[in-house]
Structure formats: C-alpha cells, structure tokens
C-alpha cells in the first residue's frame, strides 16, 4: 500500500503555530490559517486551455516576475469564472512562500510559474488559504491600493467586526 505524504506546507504551518504558542493575535491568526489550509494540486495550463487561449492570456495579462498577486488578479478579470486563490507553495520543492494562483472550474492553474518562470507547477506543493471571486478581489485591491494580501485583510476585517 502506498503511503500518502502529508502536505509539507501544512506541516510547516503547524510547526510555526507551535513556535508562536497559544496566546496573542499571531497565535489566533495561525489557528485560523490551520483551519482554512487546504492542500491542492495544480495542473498545467494546457489541461484547461487551448494553445490559442494560453497565448491570449499572455497577451492580455502580460504576467511579470515577482508579481504573482497581480498576475492572478488580472487573470481572474479576463475570465469571470476564474477564481483568485491565495496561499503558499513550495519553492523548488523546499520551503514555503506566500503565493497567488487561480482556480478554473475544479482545477487550479499557476500562470506565474508556467508563463513567467517557465517551470512545471505540478512539481511543487500548494496549500490554499482562500479562494475569492473577482468582486471581492477588486474591492480589496481598490481599498488598499495594491494587489494581494486578500486573505489577511479579510481575516482582520472579520476580527474587527466581532
């Protein structure tokens, strides 16, 4: 029987949560992230889109290095059914980095990894913290004036409403 390996990003998150301890705002945030953390698998763009559609994505989004939040946001504007996802991914199969990618139907794709870095996203581990529609992302970006940080911003809003 094949042993299923636990997602290393969730293990990493759990480890940091233990280091932080049980008290304080940071501990609360880590507990919430652990509740929301969802291991996912990303597929190649070619499993979801045609070559013509991939060329159109490159042309209209113009994805850039070190701008995954921008890339994922703009991609979600092109196709209304595409969701924006924030979470973490492994970097070269090692440590976790904060990252944004997209969900198309029931499949996850990462245009930054494929179209900018020319890397195979299926070789990395991913952990989603939140999936958002275009309206939510636009609202947050307009409010704060930059791309990204949707998950922590919404977390803080929910905490302040309580």
Question: What do these predicted ranges mean?
Answer:
Residues 1-162:
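A structural boundary/capping signal
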């Amino acid at each position: 029987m094949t042993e299923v390996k636990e997602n290393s990003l969730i293990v990493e998150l759990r480890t940091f949560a233990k280091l932080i301890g049980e008290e304080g705002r940071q501990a609360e945030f880590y507990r919430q992230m652990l509740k929301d953390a969802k291991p996912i698998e990303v597929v190649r763009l070619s499993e979801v889109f045609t070559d013509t559609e991939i060329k159109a994505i490159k042309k209209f989004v113009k994805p850039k290095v070190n701008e995954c939040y921008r890339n994922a946001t703009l991609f979600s504007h092109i196709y209304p059914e595409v969701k924006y996802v924030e979470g973490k991914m492994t970097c070269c199969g090692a440590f976790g980095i904060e990252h944004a990618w997209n969900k198309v139907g029931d499949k996850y794709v990462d245009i930054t990894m494929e179209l900018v870095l020319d890397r195979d996203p299926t070789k990395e581990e991913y952990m989603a913290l939140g999936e958002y529609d275009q309206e939510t992302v636009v609202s947050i970006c307009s409010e704060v004036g930059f791309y990204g940080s949707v998950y922590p911003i919404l977390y803080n809003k929910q905490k302040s409403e309580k």
